[in-house]
Curated annotation (Swiss-Prot):
Belongs to the chaperonin (HSP60) family. The modification Phosphotyrosine is found at residue 90. The modification N6-malonyllysine is found at residue 133. The modification N6-acetyllysine is found at residues 75, 82, 87, 91, 125, 130, 133, 156, 191, 202, 205, 218, 236, 249-250, 269, 292, 314, 352, 389, 396, 469, 481. The modification N6-succinyllysine is found at residues 31, 82, 125, 133, 191, 202, 205, 218, 236, 250, 301, 352, 396, 481. It catalyses: ATP + H2O + a folded polypeptide = ADP + phosphate + an unfolded polypeptide. There is a cross-link at residue 551 (Glycyl lysine isopeptide (Lys-Gly) (interchain with G-Cter in SUMO2)). The lineage of its organism: Eukaryota, Metazoa, Chordata, Craniata, Vertebrata. This is 60 kDa heat shock protein, mitochondrial. Homoheptamer arranged in a ring structure. The functional units of these chaperonins consist of heptameric rings of the large subunit Hsp60, which function as a back-to-back double ring. Interacts with 2 heptameric Hsp10 rings to form the symmetrical football complex. Interacts with HRAS. Interacts with ATAD3A. Interacts with ETFBKMT and EEF1AKMT3. Interacts with MFHAS1. Residues 1-26 form a transit peptide. NCBIfam families: GroEL, PRK00013.1, PRK12849.1, PRK12850.1, PRK12851.1. One of its GO terms (biological process) is response to cold. The modification Phosphoserine is found at residues 67, 70, 410, 488.
Length: 573
């Protein structure tokens, strides 16, 4: 049996090089009270100042350096907010919290990020000021949230539903910083594909903006062989009233497709084969029969990869009323194909790059059921890539897709415009959901009287309500300031005017806001205020901030350099 001293002697110190998990992590820096809040507020101010310059029709652009490519020029609040990363850890914490406000508003409403940022700054700033004078931060937060609930209820009362394409165009124009062309093109797109239809934004190839409406199921796979071309008008293959054979597997054997060809021939209908691939004997036989006998057939590779391909093929089967061969869990063999296994479409157009199936003859109830399945998946998924793919599939099964192609003279111009188009698109969707209120910050100003009827439980809650009263004036003041006029005077004049009057910063005059088309989606204004108040009032309750102290890296190269210099010197003489 070992005695205690012997045990101690046998224990060896473990090298930290050999066991890096035993090394100490970064040391922490802790700041308390007013010092921590003051530093965080400077970060909030820096970010909010950078974002606020973009607000309103006379707002300026922000140029952001990028690690690759040319600098980005934008007027999009959330893009500016995301680009800011401060060196000082405490300032950065303040900036990041307001960045979260902009991100949340962008994800929920798709617009209003600049409004959310300036509101958050105002609430945080006023909150810090009152707390430093001895107010209770928890009660202030309660007062703030009480006031916000009252404002949201008042916004819902003010809200009017969007009914006409003109109103949709007005919402889009305001969100795109007064660009009427963008407003009109978005209104046209919504007219064509419906308010719930899918509208995508892409880079255009020309100087002008273009709108393309894609009806039916279009996917980016063309014919496998150019020998399938059957028309002299362009390099494409066109069929009317055709059968569709869908296969998840590769088709190489000619025996497997003969039954489908015989069915198509017996019914005197063309056949479209969509499979993982068609090659070898099967492809050469199809091409030979196409050229020699005039067989009406075209082979196309299935779109997508993995699960996405399976889902798209299943969508096609439901839309055309057919079945997918080679699908897991089903024992369907290509050799046993029956007429009811083939999909039916009114028209097919296949080019070298893409294929389009129009007027699918699928069961309407089955299509509707599939659409509902995709909508449910959309609600659950958090991945942006998944959402994009699900939206594409949804569009193909419903009213089709509108593609907005944004034109311009350079990449920088196109990217700046694309940001505005995306914002405008999100704003119109939000307007269709919850209706519209007065724009230019007026809707929030008109909610101030509703706060007078609130009864706070104590003096600190009353301070919270007063903070929101002053904060509601900030968006209108910022828009006026960016237009080069005194914000507080403008706000005072709006408050004294009748309820539908506001300030048009573009022309510098007081106008009937609805009549002039200066309107905002209710959802955007509501989300901006709710997100700003939630995060900023929580920020004011902070008493301690903990950050990491970065380790100072020693430069390993300097000693070697000195020695090298000495050696070189010796060699020279």
């Amino acid at each position: 049996m070992l005695r205690l001293p012997t045990v101690f002697r046998q224990m060896r110190p473990v090298s930290r090089v050999l066991a890096p998990h035993l090394t100490r992590a970064y040391a922490k820096d802790v700041k308390f009270g007013a010092d921590a809040r003051a530093l965080m507020l400077r970060g909030v101010d820096l970010l909010a100042d950078a974002v606020a310059v973009t607000m309103g029709p006379k707002g300026r652009t922000v140029i952001i350096e990028q690690s690759w490519g040319s600098p980005k020029v934008t007027k999009d609040g959330v893009t500016v907010a995301k680009s800011i990363d401060l060196k000082d850890k405490y300032k950065n914490i303040g900036a990041k919290l307001v960045q979260d406000v902009a991100n949340n508003t962008n994800e929920e409403a798709g617009d209003g990020t600049t409004t959310a940022t300036v509101l958050a700054r105002s609430i945080a700033k006023e909150g810090f000021e009152k707390i430093s004078k001895g107010a209770n931060p928890v009660e202030i937060r309660r007062g703030v949230m009480l006031a916000v609930d009252a404002v949201i209820a008042e916004l819902k009362k003010q809200s009017k539903p969007v009914t006409t394409p003109e109103e949709i165009a007005q919402v889009a124009t305001i969100s795109a910083n007064g660009d009427k062309e963008i407003g009109n093109i978005i209104s046209d797109a919504m007219k064509k594909v419906g308010r719930k239809g899918v509208i995508t934004v892409k880079d255009g190839k020309t100087l002008n903006d273009e709108l393309e409406i894609i009806e039916g199921m279009k996917f980016d796979r063309g014919y496998i062989s150019p020998y399938f071309i059957n028309t002299s008008k362009g390099q494409k293959c066109e069929f009317q009233d055709a059968y569709v054979l869908l296969s998840e597997k590769k088709i190489s054997s000619v025996q497997s497709i003969v039954p489908a060809l015989e069915i198509a021939n017996a019914h005197r209908k063309p056949l479209v084969i969509i499979a993982e691939d068609v090659d070898g004997e099967a492809l050469s036989t199809l091409v030979l029969n196409r050229l020699k006998v005039g067989l009406q057939v075209v082979a196309v590779k299935a779109p997508g990869f993995g699960d996405n391909r399976k889902n798209q093929l299943k969508d096609m089967a439901i839309a055309t009323g057919g079945a997918v061969f080679g699908e897991e869990g089903l024992t369907l063999n290509l050799e046993d194909v029956q007429p009811h296994d083939l999909g039916k479409v009114g028209e097919v157009i296949v080019t070298k790059d893409d294929a389009m199936l129009l007027e699918g003859k699928g069961d309407k109830a089955q299509i509707e059921k599939r659409i509902q399945e995709i909508i449910e998946q959309l609600d659950v998924t958090t991945s942006e890539y998944e959402k994009e793919k699900l939206n594409e599939r949804l569009a193909k099964l419903s009213d089709g897709v509108a593609v907005l192609k944004v034109g311009g003279t350079s990449d920088v111009e196109v990217n700046e415009k694309k940001d505005r188009v995306t914002d405008a698109l999100n704003a119109t969707r939000a307007a269709a959901e919850e209706g519209i209120v007065l724009g230019g910050g007026c809707a929030l100003l008109r909610c101030i009287p509703a706060l007078d009827s609130l009864t706070p439980a104590n003096e600190d809650q009353k301070i919270g309500i007063e903070i929101i009263k002053r904060t509601l004036k900030i968006p209108a003041m910022t828009i006026a300031k960016n237009a080069g006029v005194e914000g507080s005077l403008i706000v005072e004049k709006i408050m004294q005017s009748s309820s539908e009057v506001g300030y048009d910063a573009m022309v510098g005059d007081f106008v009937n806001m609805v009549g002039k088309g200066i309107i905002d989606p209710t959802k955007v204004v509501r989300t901006a205020l709710l997100d700003a108040a939630g995060v900023a009032s929580l920020l004011t309750t902070a008493e301690v901030v903990v950050t990491e102290i970065p380790k100072e890296e020693k430069d390993p190269g300097m000693g070697a350099m000195g020695g090298m210099g000495g050696g070189m010197g010796g060699g020279m003489f």
